[in-house]
Structure formats: C-alpha cells, structure tokens
Amino acid sequence: MNGKRRQAGLVLGLVLLFAIHASCSAALAQEPTDWVTKFPREPVRVSAWPGGKKVALSFALFVEVFGFGQGPVLRPDLMSRNPDLVNEAFRQYAIGAGNPRVARLFKELDVPLSIVLNARFPATYPAVWKEFRALQPAAPIVAHGMNNSNDILPLGRGLAEQRDYIHRTLDLIASTTGVRPTGWSSPSVYSNGDTMQAMAAAGITYNLDQMDSDTISRLKTPDGTLVLLPYPTVTVDMGQFLARMKSANEIETLWLDYVLELASEARADPAREATTVVIGLHPFVVGTPDGAAAMRRVLSRFKKEEAVWLADTEAILKAARAN
C-alpha cells in the first residue's frame, strides 16, 4: 500500500513539475511588454550600422515656440518682474540667433541634423524659419506638437482627442513646410499609450520618446507599429543646463564620455549589438557662441571616431529596417 502511495506521489510530482515548466515556457514565449504603454515591445536587432560602425549617433535640434512670458527660465529670481526682460531675452535670443547658428555649424562641419519642430514655429517666426531651413534644406522634420507651453498633447482626455491633436500638428507642419513628418517627439517627452496608438494611426513610423535603452525597439500598438529610437534622458542638453546647472563645457564632456564609452564597449565585444543615441539639442544651450564652440569640438571629435556613424533620424530608421 505504501509503495503504491509513493508511486502515486511520484507521478503527481512529475505532473506538477511538468505543469510548472510548461507555464514558465509559455510566459517566456510571450512578447515583452512596454512598462509605460503596456503594449508589446520587442528589440530590433542590429549587428552593425553602415560601414561596420557600432554606434549610430544623431543630433536632433528642438525648434520650439513658447509664447511671450512662457518657456525656459534662466533666472527664476526675476520671473516676478513685468515685463521679465531677462528671461524673455534668454528665449528670444535662442530662437532668433541660436537656431540659425546651430544650423550653420552643422552645415559647415557637414554633419547630419534632424529638426524637431513645433508646428506653430514657422508661422510665428517666418523669417527665422526661412533662414534656418535655407541652411538645412534636407534635414528631416520630426513633429513636436503645436507648441511647447499651452498647446501640448491632451493626455487624459481620451484617444480621440489625441488623434485629433496629432493630425492637426501634422497638417499644420505639412502646410507651412511642405513636409509631412513620419517621426514624432512628444512635447516635454510627455506621452502615454493613447499617444502611441494615435501616432501610429496617423502614419507616424518612429518616435523619440524612448529614454530607457541603448538599442532600438519596436512597439506594437493596436493601430500599427512604431520604431522607438533611443533618446537618453541624461544626454539632453536642456535638462543638464537648467536642472543640473551644467555649463556647455561640462555637457561637452558628458556627451564625449557617453558616446565614446559605447564605442569602447563595442570594441571590447565586437559581437555585441550595435547601439543608438539620439541627442537632444536646444538653441538656449548650443546656440550661444560658447555653446556652439563646445558643439564644434564635440562634432569634430566624433567625426574622427571610427566606431561612430553620424546620421539623421531617418537614415537610422532606414538602416535598421535593412538589417
């Protein structure tokens, strides 16, 4: 009797073990889920970029409009003034002098630049936009909402409103620039699952809201698939400049360390996947003479780095699809 019980217990144990194994295997077989949107997200495997490069590096300049009295602040202690001439001058200088200066620098050094554009910018600053676009006529345009202050994504108001907002943004950019963007960057990197689904439905194919990886991934929304290009939090110049009080020279060091370390890792392990970095630039930081000088040194150094491929966002997307 005891022998039969032991045999039955052994059989039951094996059945339970098999069930647990099967359950674990099924769980592992499921696609990973994006931690924000809860949509399936999978890596895009890239062994190497064109020319055998291992680090794809793109610089994206944020060409934004805020409205008088709104936007980034250099001197919070002076905000109570009316008019706040110091902080408004900080913004207007960046818009009128900073944007063209960055465009000229990238043209001079023959480095690809991507434009992350608020839809209202060309009509609000037509002369600045004309000068800027003449310097960078072929740079891809990434949609960046209507403006960067009081007309941003309507989060929390449902999918339909986000769809309408994205369509209006794309329509306005198309009407003022002649280009209908296929890339998107949410104003202030503030988006959710509805945003991703709405942009896929609108024909957007890639976005710059991914801040948690060194490699490209693919997000599967109910209305289509989006390619997520890595846009690291720590490499955004504006955050380092205003929130962490870093100078242009300090940001220069950060960028060099960040990208060259990825290149060093690739040399140490040639079999590792190729990586991608999209660095966000703002004219408040790199559009001043000292900021442009730091930017010049950064670009000159990266042009000499054999492992780094300098490309715009659309070139990276095309190369990733070819892998």
Residue ranges and their predicted role:
Residues 89, 180-181, 240-249, 283-284:
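Surface-exposed cleft-lining segments at the edges of enzyme active sites
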Residues 235-236, 280-284:
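Active-site clefts of carbohydrate-active enzymes
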Residues 24-29:
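Boundary at the C-terminal end of the N-terminal hydrophobic targeting segment
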Residues 31-183, 188-227, 255-279, 287-323:
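Catalytic alpha-helical scaffold of carbohydrate-active enzymes acting on polysaccharides/glycoconjugates
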Residues 230-261:
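A conserved mid-domain beta-alpha-beta active-site/ligand-binding segment of alpha/beta enzyme cores
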Residues 11-23:
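Bacterial N-terminal signal peptides
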Residues 1-7:
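N-terminal secretory signal peptides that target proteins for export/translocation
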